[in-house]
């Protein structure tokens, strides 16, 4: 019984150690969190550095795409109370994507339309 109680207590401490603070709605998430946000919704504009119609991924630095309608304006938000992460995605059909911050899952809405630089 003491072992079980110890495990449960340890687990709850571990969960609280990974809680993240609130993040108000923003189009510019902290640089330290870009890899998190861009992993799950890679077509958000804050994930790309675009110049002269060619876009370079800010995280990998190696994936280049043509600047086109597949890169969308996004705002992100995190609620520390519920530990939910929310994307507001502005495109022709705006939508919301909500997930548990600790159990993220990719959004693949319009990533299939991203065209690699060079037409490939």
From Swiss-Prot:
Plays a role in virus cell tropism, and may be required for efficient virus replication in macrophages. It comes from African swine fever virus (isolate Pig/Kenya/KEN-50/1950). Pfam families: v110. Keywords: Signal. Belongs to the asfivirus MGF 110 family. InterPro entries: ASFV_fam_110. It comes from the Viruses. Residues 1-17 form the signal peptide. This is Protein MGF 110-14L.
């Amino acid at each position: 019984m003491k072992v079980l109680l110890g495990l449960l207590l340890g687990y709850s401490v571990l969960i609280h150690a990974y809680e993240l603070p609130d993040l108000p709605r923003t189009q510019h998430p902290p640089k330290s969190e870009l890899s998190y946000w861009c992993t799950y919704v890679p077509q958000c504009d804050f994930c790309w550095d675009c110049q002269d119609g060619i876009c370079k991924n800010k995280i990998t630095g190696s994936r280049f795409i043509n600047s086109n309608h597949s890169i969308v304006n996004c705002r992100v938000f995190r609620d520390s109370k519920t530990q939910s992460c929310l994307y507001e995605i502005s495109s022709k059909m705006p939508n919301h994507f909500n997930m548990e911050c600790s159990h993220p899952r990719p959004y693949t809405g319009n990533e299939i339309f991203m065209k690699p630089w060079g037409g490939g």
